[in-house]
UniProtKB/Swiss-Prot annotation:
Classification via InterPro entries: Ribosomal_Su5_D2-typ_SF, Ribosomal_uS9, Ribosomal_uS9_archaeal, Ribosomal_uS9_CS, Ribsml_uS5_D2-typ_fold_subgr
Protein name per its UniProtKB record: Small ribosomal subunit protein uS9
GO-annotated cellular components: cytosolic small ribosomal subunit
An example molecular function term from Gene Ontology annotations: structural constituent of ribosome
Family: Belongs to the universal ribosomal protein uS9 family.
UniProt-listed PANTHER family: RIBOSOMAL PROTEIN S16 (PTHR21569:SF16), RIBOSOMAL PROTEIN S9 (PTHR21569)
GO biological process, one term: translation
Disulfide bonds: none
Entry keywords, A to Z: Ribonucleoprotein, Ribosomal protein
UniProt organism field: Desulfurococcus amylolyticus (strain DSM 18924 / JCM 16383 / VKM B-2413 / 1221n) (Desulfurococcus kamchatkensis)
Pfam families found in the cross-reference section: Ribosomal_S9 (PF00380)
Length: 140
């Protein structure tokens, strides 16, 4: 889903999902800046989440300094949001650079970076507290 505004400017819009988090990334030519919900990625407090978000950019190396990325993400917790952002960025970079080399690099590193993680929470069953836990049984 790429849109070419002119011969010089190329903008790619991509999305990623993880559990209940949904991220939409807009990638365009720039100097390597990354914003998550209009906040620079450097200000994200959770170090593990920040590392997850920056994984695709670290993998492609110097190519990351040629694009600016803006991501809007909502839903879920901070870690599933980080995973959704990572998926959206990776998909967008593959589409932006239109390179099989970048795609194979991401797939070799982690196949869920492009395809997403299919795991979901198991639904709650009737007659139970949650999906697996049952009511406490008393014998006396």
């Amino acid at each position: 889903m790429s849109q070419t505004l002119s011969d010089k400017i190329k903008i790619v819009v991509s999305s990623g999902k993880r559990k209940t988090s949904i991220a939409r990334a807009v990638i365009k030519p720039g100097i390597g800046r990354v914003w998550i919900n209009n906040v620079p990625v450097e200000f994200i407090q959770f170090e593990l989440a920040k590392m997850k978000i920056l994984e695709p950019l670290l993998l492609i190396g110097d190519l990351a300094k040629t694009v600016d990325i803006r991501v809007n993400v909502h839903g879920g917790g901070y870690m599933s949001q980080a995973e959704a952002v990572r998926i959206a960025i990776a998909r967008g970079l593959v589409e932006f650079f239109n390179s099989d080399e970048v795609k194979s690099l991401f797939k070799e590193y982690d196949r869920h970076m492009l395809s997403g993680d299919p795991r979901q929470t198991e639904p709650k069953k009737w007659g139970r507290y949650s999906a697996r836990r049952r009511w406490q049984k008393s014998y006396r």
